């Protein structure tokens, strides 16, 4: 965090055609970022949160690792592949198909074999037993830690 606080800053006009978050993500791509931590991207205005989530998926498609946070909760866009997260035991999490995905999870209180999911609450409120592994076989998903 100290490194982020000492980073160069740009002042953006209040009235513009994109959110501050989108401007930040464009700049990150321009600078060749491999990882992005988007602070203040969750909570607050729902319209901004939804746009930031979509933009996070776009960056992930370009190979950038993205984490969104409001300081209390964290979210990670997941594309097809195997994703490992070093969670502490009892860490609560949800996996959301975004909008649909075939995915499985291991290392959770309720493991899930690869399952096609769409518009469901089945993958809400799980609990890590320790590190978890999420395999997205198709579609997109969001890992939400709370």
Give residue ranges: language-model regions.
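Structural signal for conserved beta-strand scaffold positions within catalytic alpha/beta enzyme cores
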Residues: 11-13, 68, 97
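Glycine-rich loops and low-complexity Gly/Arg-rich segments
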Residues: 15-18, 61-64, 92-94, 119-121
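Generic detector of short, locally flexible boundary/turn motifs and exposed helical patches
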Residues: 2-4, 31-33, 59-61, 69, ...
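Long, charged alpha-helical interface segments
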Residues: 71-73, 78-146
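Short beta-strand segments
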Residues: 39-41, 69, 96
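Acidic/Gly/His-enriched mid-domain segments of enzyme catalytic cores or analogous surface patches
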Residues: 1-62
């Amino acid at each position: 965090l100290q490194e982020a606080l000492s980073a160069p800053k740009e002042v953006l006009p209040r009235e513009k055609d994109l959110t501050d978050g989108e401007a930040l993500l464009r700049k990150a791509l321009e600078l060749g970022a491999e990882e992005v931590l988007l602070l203040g991207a969750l909570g607050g205005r729902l319209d901004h949160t939804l746009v930031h989530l979509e933009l996070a998926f776009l960056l992930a498609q370009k190979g950038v690792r993205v984490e969104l946070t409001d300081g209390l909760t964290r979210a990670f866009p997941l594309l097809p592949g195997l994703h490992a997260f070093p969670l502490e035991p009892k860490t609560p999490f949800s996996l959301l198909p975004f909008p649909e995905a075939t995915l499985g999870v291991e290392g959770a209180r309720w493991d899930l074999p690869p399952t096609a999911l769409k518009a469901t609450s089945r993958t809400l409120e799980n609990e890590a037993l320790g590190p978890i592994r999420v395999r997205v076989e198709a579609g997109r998903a969001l890992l939400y830690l709370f």
